[in-house]
From Swiss-Prot:
Domain of life: Bacteria
UniProt name for this protein: Methionine aminopeptidase 2
Protein species of origin: Bacillus subtilis (strain 168)
Cofactor(s) the protein requires to work: Co(2+); Zn(2+); Mn(2+); Fe(2+)
UniProtKB keywords: Aminopeptidase, Cytoplasm, Hydrolase, Metal-binding, Protease
Pfam families listed in its UniProt record: Peptidase_M24
BP term (GO), one: proteolysis
UniProt catalytic activity: Release of N-terminal amino acids, preferentially methionine, from peptides and arylamides
């Protein structure tokens, strides 16, 4: 989507704030002994309160309101009453929703409790990589400069990226053009960002793996070698100056 007027921007800001509220409420209430289904219901309550609808449920019939991935699960983890969170788990919450005809997508990874130092470093690297990519998100710049910045930050910290998962355009539907915002440098991607383009920017930073495998449930992606992955995601609007982050409170 390309934002063309203030009404569209306001619509995007509304749904961006809703998913951000849900993300933060889920992170705040996550605790050892809780099932991922219980955590999902916390996100659902926030969406329901504001009249928003889960995007993966609506568009793909996903068996949950939000995606909750734990440890070596990379993305699209199905909320389950049998999946119980433990102290030290690496938890990823990815939540996208629709309100008033506009979509927004956001995600965060965190360690439940103290946990291993390397996992805290991994989460911090994901945040740093997002910020480095964000600096390249300007109208007139090449899309592939985001991937260059993200990958360089990951490697500089001793990590790598999942190359088969990418950011994407968003706005009037969950996935739009540009279809892929790579997390590594693609020399063949010469497209330039247009002013007003709305994208979900989401680095996936890994302790080792660069690819994923399906877990066997038709949805969940995991690493093939038990590597851990942290993701940070925000929906942003590209401008000629600083991008507008729609999913930051």
């Amino acid at each position: 989507m390309i934002v063309t007027n203030d009404q569209e921007l306001e619509g995007l800001k509304k749904i961006g704030r809703i998913v951000a509220l849900a993300r933060e409420e889920m992170k705040r209430k996550a605790e050892p002994g809780m099932s991922t289904k219980d955590l999902d219901l916390i996100g659902k309550a926030v969406l329901d309160e504001h009249g928003a609808v889960s995007a993966p449920e609506k568009e793909y019939d996903f068996p949950g309101v939000t995606c909750i991935s734990v440890n070596d699960e990379v993305a699209h983890g199905i909320p389950s009453t049998s999946k119980i969170l433990k102290a030290g788990d690496l938890v990823n919450i990815d939540i996208s929703a629709e309100f008033g005809g506009f979509y927004s997508d956001t995600g965060i990874s965190f360690v439940l409790g103290e946990g291993e130092e390397r996992l805290h470093k991994l989460c911090q690297c994901a945040e740093n990589a997002f910020q480095k990519g964000l600096q390249q998100a300007k109208a007139g710049k090449r899309q592939n400069q985001i991937g260059r910045a993200v990958y360089h930050e990951a490697r500089s910290q001793g990590f790598t990226v999942i190359k088969t998962l990418t950011g994407h355009g968003i706005g009037r539907s969950l996935h739009e053009a540009p279809n892929h915002i790579m997390n590594y440098y693609d020399p063949f991607d010469n497209a330039l960002f247009k002013n007003g383009t709305v994208i979900a920017l989401e680095p996936f930073i890994s302790t080792k793996a660069e690819t994923i495998v399906e877990a066997g449930d038709g949805w969940t992606f995991k690493t093939p070698d038990k590597s851990m992955v942290a993701q940070v995601e925000h929906t942003i609007v590209i401008t000629k100056d600083e991008p507008i982050i729609l999913t930051k409170l």
